[in-house]
Amino acid sequence: MKAMQAYDQTTQLKLKSKDAIIHFDEGLIGFSDFKDFVLMENDSLAPFRLLQSLESPQVGFLVLEPTALANNYYDLVPAREWESLGVTKKTKPLAFVIVVIGNTPQGSTGNFQAPLLVNYEKMVGKQIILTDSGLSVRQPLV
C-alpha cells in the first residue's frame, strides 16, 4: 500500500504535536465523518496547501487562501460565522477554498461559495455556504 506509506511518512514529518490538528465539529460538506485534519505546506505546492484527514489517508483536499484572488473575501463572511468559532478582533481568522486542478490552468477552479473557516488559535474550523456572495462553487483561478 504505497499511498498509506506516503501518508504515514508525511504525517510523521509534518505533525509535530496534537496542537497542529484542526477539528471540524461537523466535518466538511459531503465528508461529515471526517473531523480532524492537518494543514500541510510544501514549497512545491505553493501557494496551495493540503488539508489532510487524519482519519483516512484517502481524504485530502488541495486548498488556497481566497485572498490570493479576492482581496475583500473576508468581508463576505458574516461576523456570526467567525464568532461561532471564537474569533475575536485579536484573533487572526483564516479562510480556505477547496481547489480542483483542471487539465489546463484555465480549467482549475476553487469553491469560493463554500469556504473553510479556521480559528488557528483554537484549532477549530467549519465549512459554510455563502449564499449571497455572487461567487461560484467553480470559480476560475486564472
Per-segment meaning from a language model:
Residues 2-71, 90-142:
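Long, compositionally biased stretches
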Residues 73-77:
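Extended catalytic/binding region for NAD+/ADP-ribose chemistry, centered on the ART fold
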Residues 79-89:
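Short active-site loop/helix that positions an aromatic residue
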